[in-house]
Each structure stands twice: as structure tokens, then as C-alpha cells.
Amino acid sequence: MSASGPLFEASEASIRPGPDGGTVGERSLGVLKSVFGYDSFRLPQHEFVDQVGEGGEAFVLLPRGGGKSLCFQIPALVREGTGLVVSPLIALMDDQVSALRENGVRAAAIHSGLDSKTSWRYERELEEGKLDLVYVAPERVLSERFQEVLKRSKLSVIAIDEAHCVSQWGHDFRPEYVQLGALAELFPDVPRMALTATADGPTRREIVEKLGLQQARVFTRSFNRPNIRLRIGAKDEPRKQLLRFLREEHPGDSGIVYRLSRAEVEKTAEWLSKEGVRALPYHAGLPAETRRRNQQVFLREEGVVVVATIAFGMGIDKPDVRFVAHLDLPKSVEAYVQETGRAGRDGMPSNAWMVYGFQDIAMMRSMIQGSEAPEERKRVELHKLNSLLGLCETASCRRQALLSYFGETLPEPCGNCDTCLEPQRSFDGTEAAQKALSAVARTGQVFGVAHAIDVLMGNLTDKITLNRHDQLPTFGVGKDLGKPAWNAVFRQLAAQDLLGVDMERYGRLYLTERSWEVLKGQRPVQLRTEAVREAKKEKRKVSVILGAGIDPGLLKDLKFLRMELAKEQGVPPYVVFGDKTLHEMAQAHPRTELEFSQLFGVGATKATRYGPRFLELLRSR
């Protein structure tokens, strides 16, 4: 059943508690358990729910997988009226509406994908108070006609999701979001909230200012996602590196692979498909129907890998994405957090895997500097890129470095990133840097990395012989290091902005003022060793993922039943039950309706709707 299709008749009763059901906190806990099947709130969910449930305003900054949606869904259910949710993407609206309906909540999404008859019916139900939550796009909520509909309705709360779209410096900027501050004047008595999963200090201030939330209470939670393993390595043969990663660590798993260009998206998806991986492309240049179909396959089926540009992701609410891979650099730490945060939203072990190289740095800098953006914006974007490069090149705990960018402190190394698991060290790399920069200077600053490395290693190539570069004093001074090591040196020099690259002239290297400071001994250089990796990769331990005492055969049968039920209901499998619920089901082996209803993620509606089928399977084992 489509999220936009009919579900509730006008006479169907709401699952929300009555106003005499106790305090806001008590009613919220009741809804949390009876509707969503959770026993307790995560911090700071309960504080936020109480704040808005009692009529206050709030700005919520939670990482992906932090339970952000519950922060506006529960206040909407404990207050009288209909909750209005402003969301930027149709897919995101439909996913959340499907999940809410599965839990017995009267929800609807009104968007351009509906026929006029269905839109009018939902508007009528909104005015008549027959909806608990309604999702709309910013363009619709700003239209005078729809605002008249809202004025004739009783609103419980107004939630502006993905609020970072208000930032003109952000990669998801939506001009319509800037105008949403007008809702404060139109509905002064309705509590408002803004929610986002990623925003640095300047973006947070911009959200508060543009949306008129100066009096709002701010709620934040750590950006730490300890279930996601962070890994960033040197790019060598990216497709082969990716395929090895998928085969060794994620066979049959759902995941997202990000590429910078549309052409690389299609090439990578086609190549993976030929190698036996079920891979689908996604980018803005594909026909709308192809994008919709590929996204639906990814959401509703298991073991699908989507290869995409950043056009894919913000509307994805799939909790069982086991990995996010980058074969190209994101634009900033915020983009990296936003994109990798789509992995492991169910709290189970997942991977954020990335490879990058010298050309990635040069390409990103060239794109920023060559854009038509104002100089101020270019400076901001270059600063953000340099912060990301610092994260990529750190020799200390990667998670500590990531969290420090957002002003957080992790007291101890995380133990779940590549730099913790395969320790690297920093060393005084001034001499190596001087050799590399000298090779660039003495060859006239007109060649690329490969030629400079050949000079350093003393390789007699045709180009070196033709240009008589074998006569240079720098020729052969780097024979003590291999080609991978010199590639790492040049990459790190570029990352530290100690070497210029002209992409318009085929990646020629040139020296900057900072380069000359290094050559003259006025600026020391710290480099890091490349991690020494075991030839035999350690494969993911299935027992860690499954948990103790779980029968893999039973879990497979539970997943098969879930898929059957999902097809019957016309929803993605995770909307029926998430992986975490199935794992607990396989481990606890409930035999009675009461035991089943006490499982994580099993609310009253799902216990009634799905309990008999799952209990029949469990009792047969």
C-alpha cells in the first residue's frame, strides 16, 4: 500500500491518549511503548518531548540514527490537534508516513505526487481533525491557498525537518526554507521546532535566525556513532578496492557508494553489476521514473547497492544500510557526516569506508576556486575542505578528530576506526617534503605527480630522457622510498596546502609561498606513515553481528516472513520490523502474545497485525 494511498476511514479512532492520561511525560512514555514499541527515551529525547509537548519551542540537533523523528511525532500525538511536518523530499515523507501507518498512526503526506482528488481528501481530513500528522513540502506550506487550509485546522505542533536546508552555505540549501520563519507570525500559538542531523556553529546560528527560533531551547546529542567503523585509505585502484571491500566484508548487504560525477556513477554501477553485485545507479540526470524505481528497489529489497551522487540520500530513511562507501572526497566534514550517517541507523555494526588520492584533492580545490560563487563563499568552502583533509590525514583516533570539529571531546580513542585498529604514526617529514618540492621546482613546475615521482626514484622514462631530467641533482634522491610512499607524500603535501595543482593544465604541480618556506627550512612538515595492512584481511565476524545464541537459520526464516508481509502491505521490510527486532526475536524466542509484545520495536498495532504470523513460525522451531 502506497504511503500516499487511502488508509484511514473518517470514522477510525486515533491511537493518541486522552488529555486526562496524566502528565505530558507520562502520556509521552505511554505513546512511546504502545505505538512505537520502545520502553524508554534516549537522551535528550524525553527533555525535548516534554519541552514541545508542554507548548515550548525547540531546536534539535541529533545525529542520524538518533531518533530525530520521534522528537516531533510524539509531541504531535500527545497534544490536541494535527502535527504539521515540513519535509524537503517526497520520498522522505512517504517513508515516514508508511512507518507511522504501520504503527496505527493516522498520517498523510500531501505532495505533487498525488492526484488532486487524494490531495483534497487529505486536506478535508486535516480540517476535520482526522489526521494525527500531515507531511508537506516547504513550497506547499508557503502557498496562500494551503495556509488558509491550515488556518481552518487545529495544529498541535509545527516541525521543520532537515532544517540545515535553510543555510545558504550548505550543500542542501533550499531557498524556500528561508521563508519558513513566517510560520511564527501565522501560527503564534503553535509550538515550533527545527530539527537537523548535521550543522556546524555558523549553520546553527543561521537556522535560529532565519526560522525565528531565538527563544527556542536548544537540544543536542553527541555526533558519536560508535556502531559505525570509520575507515579512510589511499586510493589506488578504486573499483577493485571497492569490490574487495564488498566481497570480504559485506556480501549480500545493502549499502550506498558515493561518486562525484554522474558518469562515474553509471560506470561504477555497470562494472559492479558485471562483477556480480546487484548495483543500481542514481543521479539527478536519470529520468525521474528510473530514479524512483531504483530508489524503491533499494528501499524494499535486501542486498541492493546504490551507486549515487549526493543527489541520493537525504530522502532515505532505511535503517539497515550496512555500509556507506566513498570513492571520491565529499566537500566537507559536514557532508561526510551527513552521508556516512546513513549507515547503521538501526544501531547495528556498519562501515563508513572511503579511499581518496592526490587527484581528489586537486579536483575539489579546482571546483571550488573555479566556481562563480562569491569570494567569501569560496573561502568558506576551502576552509571546510581543508578541515576534511585534516580528518583524512590524521594519525590519531579518527573519531576523536571528527568529534572535535563539532566541539566535542572523546576522552579515549574509540577503538573502532582504522587509525585505532591499524595504528599509524607521525614523523618529521621535512626532508621528504623538501625532496618532493625540489623535484617540482627543478623540473620547471610544468609536470604532474607521476613525472616528479619518476625523477625522485631515478626512473629513466622517455619523458625524463627527452627533458634531460636525469641530469638534475634531484634525480634518484628518493630511491629509499617506493612509489606508494611518494604518492602518500605528495598527497599529504597537497592536503596540507603546501603544494599547488593546476587542473586546467593537466594537473601540473607548482610551488606556493608556503612551498618555498618548506624548501628554505622555514616551515617544518609533519607527515604520517601509511598503515601497514595485513595481506590477509580480517573478515567481519558474523557472530558479532548476530549476537550470542542466535540460530542463523531461524533469522533467515524470520527475514523471509518479514519480506512476505512487507510485500502484502506494500511497504519496505524494515517498516514491518527492523533488523534489531528480528535479532531480538531470534534470541528471545517468544512463545506467547505477551512475550512478543515486549520485544524492542513492537507496539500494540504491530503486535496485533503481525504477532500471530511470527509466533506461528517461532513456535514451530
Language model features with spans:
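Accessory DNA-binding and partner-docking regions appended to nucleic-acid-acting proteins
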Residues: 1-28, 380-382, 411-621
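Helicase motor core with emphasis on the C-terminal RecA-like subdomain
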Residues: 17-35, 39-43, 47-69, 77-79, ...
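Short, charged low-complexity linear segments at domain edges
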Residues: 375-408
